[in-house]
Swiss-Prot record:
This is CRISPR-associated endonuclease Cas1. The keyword Glycoprotein does not apply. CRISPR (clustered regularly interspaced short palindromic repeat), is an adaptive immune system that provides protection against mobile genetic elements (viruses, transposable elements and conjugative plasmids). CRISPR clusters contain spacers, sequences complementary to antecedent mobile elements, and target invading nucleic acids. CRISPR clusters are transcribed and processed into CRISPR RNA (crRNA). Acts as a dsDNA endonuclease. Involved in the integration of spacer DNA into the CRISPR cassette. Plasmid targeted by CRISPR locus P1 transform wild-type cells very poorly. GO terms for biological process: defense response to virus; maintenance of CRISPR repeat elements. The gene is cas1. It comes from the Archaea. Belongs to the CRISPR-associated endonuclease Cas1 family. There are 3 CRISPR RNA loci in this organism and a single cas gene locus. A CRISPR-Cas type I-B system. Keywords: Antiviral defense, DNA-binding, Endonuclease, Hydrolase, Magnesium, Manganese, Metal-binding, Nuclease, Plasmid. It comes from Haloferax volcanii (strain ATCC 29605 / DSM 3757 / JCM 8879 / NBRC 14742 / NCIMB 2012 / VKM B-1768 / DS2). It is an enzyme of class 3 (hydrolase).
């Protein structure tokens, strides 16, 4: 059976009915969801669940990503790993603790991230504006990455690149959508809200991908380990945000699949409405399922698989020293 991400927006209760998940909504509806069909479960509503439901999800290796009020990401329940490797975790921590090894991996992550930002601007240069000078600056910043000798220097180069990249958004987006500047917690306008929501989806996709390996999601290389976040997921997400989040922002806005009516402004800032979230998620899942011909694998792979391939490449690098192939847009 082909597995897919499943999103639940209803409020209610999630329970186990033999080998199937049962959803009882507050409106009195009952739905059944075969657990074998789920790659990851996303809970967007106010859902209660018991240990029997978690046991079933754990047995089938299904992660659960939980979103709170107005779809703010709250955390993930990660089931017991199908792959356990103490050696992998040891090598991951050793690489983090070794400045040279950590920088080598960090360089590849940020080089790929800047490359993918630059690829977006190259695509829109001439279509939505003249971005040639920024494209050239991003090329220079990508080259400068390998010269950094400390993680804070590396992050400074990435921050400079991202600011210049975001400065081009207002030229790419159709009015009345504007970014002005990147703001979150809370998002200050519709574009910031859309970017934040999609960045969250990319992040949780990376959490799911890492869970399928023996890598520890809390040990990153660019982002410092913290108590409340999976820093390796943040690292991998930086590679894929331009590809999966930003390109979708441009497409949704410029094709008018999303309008200002899909947002609401409150004291908490500007946020997507429920209908807006449904529209965005449908397109995001469609994007994950799209395929490209992979030059190394010699076959078509989905973007969801591309994230998984990236993570496996990092794991192989840690264990064998083979080059880490951080994903740079080639198509």
């Amino acid at each position: 059976m082909t597995k897919a991400n499943h999103h639940i927006f209803a409020d209610g209760e999630l329970s186990r009915k033999e080998g199937t998940l049962r959803i009882d909504t507050l409106e009195g509806e009952t739905k059944y969801l075969p657990v074998e069909s789920i790659d990851a479960l996303y809970l967007h509503g106010q859902i209660s669940f018991n240990t029997r439901a978690l046991g079933l999800l754990n047995k089938h290796g299904v992660p659960v990503h939980i979103f709170g009020w107005k779809d703010y990401y709250r955390g993930s329940y990660l089931p017991k790993r199908s792959q356990l490797s103490g050696n992998t975790v040891v090598e991951q921590v050793r690489a983090y603790d070794n400045t040279e090894r950590r920088l080598r991996i960090g360089h590849r992550i940020i080089e790929a991230s800047i490359h993918n930002m630059r690829a977006n601007l190259q695509y829109y240069s001439g279509r939505r504006g003249d971005f040639d000078s920024v494209v050239e600056t991003l090329r220079e910043l990508k080259t400068a990455v390998s010269d950094t000798q400390r993680i804070d220097e590396l992050r400074a180069v990435e921050g400079d690149a991202r600011k210049r990249y975001y400065d081009c958004f207002d030229s790419i987006l159709e009015a009345p959508f504007r970014l002005a500047k990147r703001e979150y917690n809370p998002p200050s306008n519709e574009t910031n809200a859309l970017i934040s929501f999609l960045n969250g989806m990319v992040y949780t996709s990376c959490v799911s991908a890492i869970r399928k390996t023996a890598l520890d999601p809390t040990v990153g290389f660019v982002h410092e380990p913290g108590e409340r976040r999976f820093t390796l997921s943040l690292d991998i997400a930086d590679i894929f945000k331009p590809i999966l989040a930003d390109r979708l922002v441009f497409r949704l806005v410029n094709r008018k699949q999303i309008t200002t009516d899909d947002f609401e402004t409150e004291l908490a800032g500007c946020l997507l409405t429920e209908q807006g979230r449904l529209t965005v998620l449908e397109e995001f899942e469609r994007s994950l399922d799209q395929t490209v011909q992979h030059p190394r694998l010699k076959r078509k792979v989905s973007f969801k698989t591309l994230i998984q391939t990236d993570v496996y490449s990092l794991k192989k690098h840690l264990l064998t020293g083979e080059p880490y192939h951080a994903t740079e847009k080639w198509w």
